[in-house]
Amino acid sequence: KLCDMVTPQMRVAGKVLVSESGVSDTDDIKVLAKSHADALLIGTVLMEAVKPQELIAEFKGVYDNEYDKTELIDQNGLTEVKICGITSMVDVNLLIKYGADYGGMVVFYPKSKRDVTIEEAGRMVEILKKSDIKTVAVTVSPDEEQILKIQDKGFDYVQIHGELSENVYNLCKLPIIRAVNISQDDTDSVKKSIESATAMDKVVGILLDAGIPGSGKTFDWDSVKELELKEKKLFLAGGLNSSNVAAAIKCVEPDVVDISSGVEYDDVLIKGKDEQKVKEFICNARAAK
């Protein structure tokens, strides 16, 4: 009961939640797993155990199995989180640890510093799928050969920026997330792009971004209210970070918030995602109302 007093903000601040009593068997461990405690203090039952090390291993196995890694707090009805531009197994483990809903990998776009080979992406897909995290191949103006290679690696979605040719569309068997760059000085062009995308049956989501993907730039969120997305899922990207994600969710009410540069290290020479930023972003997104 007391675990309800631990707020998401306290977790983000690095407060450690310890459960200090009441453990006698694996059923108790299963109950405590729902609290997302960082540590369990177990005394008497271990002191009385014939083989305490084996009991610790059993308790830990049960706890890890019961711990719902896709939740930091109750997520029912809340905005989902997509971490884009992951480049390594270290990034993959962060998504699993903090409960991201989607993991995006940039492929066939060497201009991006986040570009990975299709083989590297495939290995990350295998691990993410085991944790029920949806996988997204992020690419720009793919050709027919590239779309086939993406499909062969078992991605759940393909996110397409730039051009989407008729041949590629017809060949694609994956659900498509169509990216649209929001330009404040060309509203008509944006509306036409969205109208075209929403008319496509294979397009299940519209991703709204500002300028160059991964640039960290925002756009006028109020402008989204004027757009007709029909029944397509709305992915909101562009300049999001842990400080503004709650405001973005409140203003736009997106289905998914999408972040890349906002969870990377301040030092541009360090590649990959910053664990503290990933944790803060996901926790703040979950807490937003």
Name these PLM-found stretches.
Residues 31-35, 58, 94-97, 149, ...:
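Well-formed, non-transmembrane alpha-helical positions, independent of function
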Residues 22-23, 35-58, 100-112, 157-165, ...:
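Glycine-rich phosphate-binding active-site loops on the catalytic face of alpha/beta enzymes
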Residues 1-13, 104-113, 119-244, 264:
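Conserved anion-binding
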Residues 18-24, 73-88, 136-142, 181-188:
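Active-site mouth loops of central-metabolism enzymes
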Residues 5, 33, 46-76, 117-128, ...:
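C-terminal helical cap(s) of enzyme catalytic domains, especially alpha/beta-barrels
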Residues 12, 35-36, 98-99, 153, ...:
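Structural motif
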Residues 32, 43, 95, 158, ...:
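Conserved, mostly hydrophobic/aromatic
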